[in-house]
Amino acid sequence: MTTELHDDASGRLIVGLDVPTIAEAEKVVEELGNAVSFYKIGYQLVFAGGLDFAKSLVAARKKVFLDMKLLDIDNTIAKGVENVAKMGVSMLTLHAYPKAMRAAVEAARGSDLCLLGVTVLTSMDNADLREAGYFDNAETLVLKRARQAHEAGMGGIVASAVEAQAIRQAVGPDMAIVTPGIRPAGSEKGDQKRVMTPADALRAGASHLIVARPIVGAPDRKAAALAILKEMRSIGRS
């Protein structure tokens, strides 16, 4: 299924709750208040009770991106996706392998769950791909997987904003392009290698931006989020 691409920046900013405990996640959400409506929950928080926390966010009318990067045999993927669809979360990731994506799309049919195919992690560059046994460079592999996700009927993909413009040209206007590795000007890259500022990512064609450390690690989290939202609104719909 496709997902609505929000014109309002608050629906396009996804804050990554990359924290070790539910208590810390609750503190982040409380501090951000009404400024942020969309949160990403990944492995770190899932293994600390994050699935129940995801349900509580949904009950509080927040949107949840469950970043599980699933990859397994078709039947296992399908059964897992069926249960995730019942949780009421908005987005779920799986690795962009054709058979897995097709199984997931069929399992999510009739629900509001937007399935996202993960192309190449933003922490990886061409040298990392060669070490892992891939012969394609990052952009070639990203575009190949983006096209496969589109053909499978996925709602969107996860990819670096560096490749967003080429992806948008390849898959058209309807798929979500969700971009991690977003760093405001002057921020440190951390362990990310293919990064971009919020404004540049939107200009390149990204539909949603994932921001974690620049907000969660800021002394004033709400001020950091509002600054990014202001930058996003200055660009408008890409």
Curated annotation (Swiss-Prot):
Substrate binds at residues 18, 40, 67-76, 122, 183, 192, 213. GO terms for molecular function: orotidine-5'-phosphate decarboxylase activity. Pathway: Pyrimidine metabolism; UMP biosynthesis via de novo pathway; UMP from orotate: step 2/2. GO terms for biological process: 'de novo' pyrimidine nucleobase biosynthetic process; 'de novo' UMP biosynthetic process. CDD domains: OMP_decarboxylase_like (cd04725). Signal peptide: none annotated. Disulfide bonds: none annotated. Keywords: Decarboxylase, Lyase, Pyrimidine biosynthesis. It comes from the Bacteria. It catalyses: orotidine 5'-phosphate + H(+) = UMP + CO2. The active site is at 69 (proton donor). Its EC number is 4.1.1.23. The keyword Ribosomal protein does not apply. Gene3D superfamilies: Aldolase class I. GO terms for cellular component: cytosol. Homodimer. Belongs to the OMP decarboxylase family. Type 1 subfamily. Catalyzes the decarboxylation of orotidine 5'-monophosphate (OMP) to uridine 5'-monophosphate (UMP). HAMAP family: OMPdecase_type1_B. This is Orotidine 5'-phosphate decarboxylase. The lineage of its organism: Bacteria, Pseudomonadati, Pseudomonadota, Alphaproteobacteria, Hyphomicrobiales. The gene is pyrF.
